[in-house]
Structure formats: C-alpha cells, structure tokens
Amino acid sequence: MKRTLKMILALSLLGAPMARSQDNVPILSGALAFLGSSNGGANSYEPILAPVLVAPFGDHWLVESRAEVLGFIARENGTSGPYSGTFAATFDYLQLDYLANTHLTVTVGRFLTPFNIYNERMPVWITNLEDGPIIYTIGTRTSGSSNGFMVRGDLVAHPEWSVNYTAYFSAATTTENLQSGRAAGGRMGVFLPQTGLEVGASYQRFLQNGDYNAYGAYAIWEPPPIPLDVRAEFAHSPGGHGYWLEGAYHLASSRGTSTWLSRLQAVARVQQFIKGSNPQPGDFLPTVNVNQFDIGLNYYLPHELRLNGSYGRQYSSAGNANVWNFAITYRFLFPAWPGGHQ
C-alpha cells in the first residue's frame, strides 16, 4: 500500500513541468467520502479518497488516472464483536490517450472496463445510490479495470443523432493493486441529443478460467427541460442475469432552477437478479435469486458537498433484509500544482 500511495503522490505532480510551457493545465479532481451502511443488522463504515488526474500535453495526448484509497470498518462477527478496520489502495485507471480526431481515440494502459454504463460513468461522487447494482460484476470482472488497449469514438456524428463505439482487449494481470482479467469486448450506443436519450449494448468474451460470454444493454434518458435522470441496465452471464432501473428527480421546475428546494433530489431503484445454471469462480454474483428496491434522498449543498441517505429492502430465499445507507461526499477540483490556473 505504501508503494501505491507514493505512486498516487507522484501522479498528482506529474503535469507540473510540462504545463508551465503550455496553456493546457493538469487538473486534480475527485472526491472524499464517508459511507455508512447497515445490511441486515451488520453495520459497516467506509472512508474513501478517490483522486483523479487529467494531464494534457500537446494537441493530441492526454494522461488520465484515478486512484482509490478505501477503508472498511465493521464488527469482527458481523453483528457482534469489536470493530476492526482494513485499508487498501488501488489504481482504477492509469492510461495514455491519443486523440486522433472525434472518430478515434486510442488508449493504452489501465482503464475502466467499458461494459454498459455503471462502471465508467458513475463514480462515488456521481452515483445516486451508494450501493452498486447486483449485476455490476457481470462484464467487469475481475477488478472493474482492464490492462491493455482500447479504441473509442463517434462512428457517425450528426446534429440530431450520433453513434458511439468502444472496443478493447485486456491481458490477465495478478500484480497487487493492478489486477485484471484476460478479455475482449466492446460497446456501441446511439445518442439523441434533442431528447436526451442514449441506448446501447455491450459484449465481452472472458478468455480465462473457461471462456464464456457476457452481454448487456443500457439506456439513459435525461430530458433537457425536466430535471429527471433515468438509467437502466440489463446484463447476462453464465452465473446469472438481471436488470436495474433507476430514476432521480430534482425538486425543481427545470434544470436551470437554483433554489434551496431544487438542491433536493429524490431517487428510486428496482433491481432483480436470476441465478444462472453455470456460475463461474470469482464472478461475485449471488447464489440465489434476489429482488431489491431502494429509495433515497440526496441534498446538494454549496461548495460541492452532498448528503445522501437511502433505504432498501432485499428479498431472497437466503433471507430478507433491510439495507440502510448514508453518505457525505465532497467533490474537489483544482490545478495539480500550486499557482496553476485554469
């Protein structure tokens, strides 16, 4: 962990020498969060630091990195015994991008596995509910990150619609904090900007421990006049299949409204998982069928501070349980070295 923390510090200073001679300024952003959860009476707490570095150089090159320092504090026996904690540090991604044009970006290094939308687009400071979906590990094993290369861009771009694509290959890696599976896959989506609708599909071929396929579909709807966000995913693998559907609404008449009440956001999510006939080792999926609903409230305070609370009820043959969560999240953004400017 000490080695990883040193690498995180080094990355935060990476852009300083090159940016002094360029207009593009490396930016350090990310989030600091504290999460609490009670699942069936078992309480746990998670402090999280997730710094993100974006360092452009030249007209076509970009370095991107996100690290995560995560703590987990819980009772030793679940619902009894003294509290104990562990801390771990890892890199979610550390990648070099070559931006050829709007149709092609080439990435090498470690990157978030682009299966559906949750893994790439909903980090801790954006996700509306702190618990990830049950089907999250489908298409993202072994760590949610891939080590290899990726290409992405707009296949077709029109003012009224566009088609985006992503394709990648990942090598198997067992290095501490940099684990990944050997896999290949891709994603394609269609975006309609006037309606705020995007739909797409994902595919992955996992190439180790017995090759198998995973596939999925997603939808995002953000109608421009209304402060409503709707997101959904479906995913299937030999270990099971399922879906989640989530809606979030700011209590405002439009997206441009800014009042104390408009900072309040109501959230609801339903999800279902059906176990498969051929579970794979290390797929981290339930061994029984599961249904769950969650409701929550987010309040966005000034200065990038957010409060979150939610309640969920999980139903399965292994037993029903109440799931309570709360979180406080601070999002930061500033130049990567003292005296820098945007």
Predicted regions and their residues:
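Outer-membrane beta-barrel biogenesis signature
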Residues: 7-43, 255-264, 332-342
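Positively charged n-region of N-terminal signal peptides that target proteins for export
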Residues: 1-6
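Oxyanion-binding "anion nests"
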Residues: 200, 204, 208-237
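Outer-membrane beta-barrel "beta-signal"
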Residues: 151, 247, 320-342
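C-terminal hydrophobic structural anchor segments
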Residues: 253-315
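Outer membrane beta-barrel
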Residues: 23-32, 40-172, 180-182, 189-196, ...
